[in-house]
Amino acid sequence: MPLKKAVYPGSFDPITYGHIDIIERGLKVFDTVIVAVARNSEKNSLFNVEERIALIREVLGDNSRAKVDTFDGLLVDYVRKQGATVIIRGLRAVSDFEYEFQLAQMNRSITQEVETLFMMTSVPYSYLSSSIVKEVSSLNGPIDGLVPPLVKKALDAKFNRS
């Protein structure tokens, strides 16, 4: 039986406990989850791609079933090149659904070889986003419980706090 691979794409700027929750739950369904960090020049990122990859790898530790990679261009092309058949997307609220639905339908119109699997975020993370974490952190607000300690430390360094 072939191994089932899924791709979990995003900017992960920075990775949060919400992202980690989706990755861990994805690993219960798939043999391998590829965390694919988007090289998106249109987004104004706090962490560069290499920093985001390093944080994700450190957070995931030595889990051999979770891979970290980058991609640019069409997501479905990347998914096919990886030999994966599923894109995992996390949904926090109804407001996420319409945008994610449109992306899934567009991907489906490009290729029917790739499915999109929506995973509802766990309740404690239903409001959580990287943008909220960055904003609260930039104002020296508490982000404990939102990101792992090493991510908090990296955010403190970005905002010149030690």
Curated annotation (Swiss-Prot):
Name by which UniProt lists this protein? Phosphopantetheine adenylyltransferase
Per the entry, what this protein does is:
Reversibly transfers an adenylyl group from ATP to 4'-phosphopantetheine, yielding dephospho-CoA (dPCoA) and pyrophosphate.
Instruction: Spell out the NCBIfam families in the cross-references.
Output: coaD_prev_kdtB, cyt_tran_rel
Q: Give me any GO biological process, just one.
A: coenzyme A biosynthetic process
Q: Which reaction does it catalyse?
A: (R)-4'-phosphopantetheine + ATP + H(+) = 3'-dephospho-CoA + diphosphate
Q: Where the protein is mainly located, per its record?
A: cytoplasm
Keyword Cytoplasm listed: yes
Q: Where in the cell is the protein located?
A: Cytoplasm
Site, Transition state stabilizer: residue positions:
H19
Which species is the source of this protein? Geotalea uraniireducens (strain Rf4) (Geobacter uraniireducens)
Q: What class of enzyme is it?
A: transferase
Q: Enumerate the residues binding ATP.
A: S11, F12, H19, G90, L91, R92, E100, Y125, S126, Y127, L128, S129, S130, S131
